[in-house]
């Protein structure tokens, strides 16, 4: 198995994500407000993208359901007409 080594990039960026506390210990930095805003914006954008897809899926589902209901109605009407014709002729 390959052992992970600290590359210069990891070493150079490692200090960005940590900060030294008053006692000298390194703690994770809190996210910057702009990055939090950006994440919120990304989530809103994704929600706006997902919402029309959900609407399309619902419309597709409804269009699938409606032909079934229509075909059932058509079948019932045809049978009723055949039945009533048969009743009238006999």
Swiss-Prot record:
<keyword id="KW-1035">Host cytoplasm</keyword>
<feature type="region of interest" description="Mitochondrial targeting sequence">
    <location>
        <begin position="65"/>
        <end position="87"/>
    </location>
</feature>
<dbReference type="InterPro" id="IPR021045">
    <property type="entry name" value="Flu_proapoptotic_PB1-F2"/>
</dbReference>
<dbReference type="GO" id="GO:0044192">
    <property type="term" value="C:host cell mitochondrial inner membrane"/>
</dbReference>
<keyword id="KW-1048">Host nucleus</keyword>
<comment type="subunit">
    <text>Oligomer. Interacts with human SLC25A6/ANT3 and VDAC1. Interacts with host MAVS.</text>
</comment>
<keyword id="KW-1046">Host mitochondrion inner membrane</keyword>
<keyword id="KW-1045">Host mitochondrion</keyword>
<keyword id="KW-1043">Host membrane</keyword>
<keyword id="KW-1119">Modulation of host cell apoptosis by virus</keyword>
<feature type="site" description="Low pathogenicity">
    <location>
        <position position="66"/>
    </location>
</feature>
<protein>
    <recommendedName>
        <fullName>Protein PB1-F2</fullName>
    </recommendedName>
</protein>
<dbReference type="GO" id="GO:0052150">
    <property type="term" value="P:symbiont-mediated perturbation of host apoptosis"/>
</dbReference>
<keyword id="KW-1113">Inhibition of host RLR pathway by virus</keyword>
<dbReference type="GO" id="GO:0044164">
    <property type="term" value="C:host cell cytosol"/>
</dbReference>
<comment type="similarity">
    <text>Belongs to the influenza viruses PB1-F2 family.</text>
</comment>
<keyword id="KW-0945">Host-virus interaction</keyword>
<comment type="function">
    <text>Plays an important role in promoting lung pathology in both primary viral infection and secondary bacterial infection. Promotes alteration of mitochondrial morphology, dissipation of mitochondrial membrane potential, and cell death. Alternatively, inhibits the production of interferon in the infected cell at the level of host mitochondrial antiviral signaling MAVS. Its level of expression differs greatly depending on which cell type is infected, in a manner that is independent of the levels of expression of other viral proteins. Monocytic cells are more affected than epithelial cells.</text>
</comment>
<dbReference type="GO" id="GO:0042025">
    <property type="term" value="C:host cell nucleus"/>
</dbReference>
<dbReference type="GO" id="GO:0016020">
    <property type="term" value="C:membrane"/>
</dbReference>
<keyword id="KW-0899">Viral immunoevasion</keyword>
<keyword id="KW-1090">Inhibition of host innate immune response by virus</keyword>
<keyword id="KW-1097">Inhibition of host MAVS by virus</keyword>
<keyword id="KW-0472">Membrane</keyword>
<dbReference type="GO" id="GO:0039545">
    <property type="term" value="P:symbiont-mediated suppression of host cytoplasmic pattern recognition receptor signaling pathway via inhibition of MAVS activity"/>
</dbReference>
<keyword id="KW-0053">Apoptosis</keyword>
<dbReference type="Pfam" id="PF11986">
    <property type="entry name" value="PB1-F2"/>
</dbReference>
């Amino acid at each position: 198995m390959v052992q992970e080594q600290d590359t210069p990039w990891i070493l150079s960026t490692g200090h960005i994500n940590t900060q030294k506390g008053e006692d000298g210990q390194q703690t994770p930095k809190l996210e910057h407000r702009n990055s939090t805003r950006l994440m919120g914006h990304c989530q809103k954008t994704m929600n706006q993208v997902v919402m029309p897809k959900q609407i399309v899926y619902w419309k597709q589902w409804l269009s699938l359901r409606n032909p079934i209901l229509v075909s059932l109605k058509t079948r019932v009407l045809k049978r009723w007409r055949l039945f009533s014709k048969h009743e009238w002729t006999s």
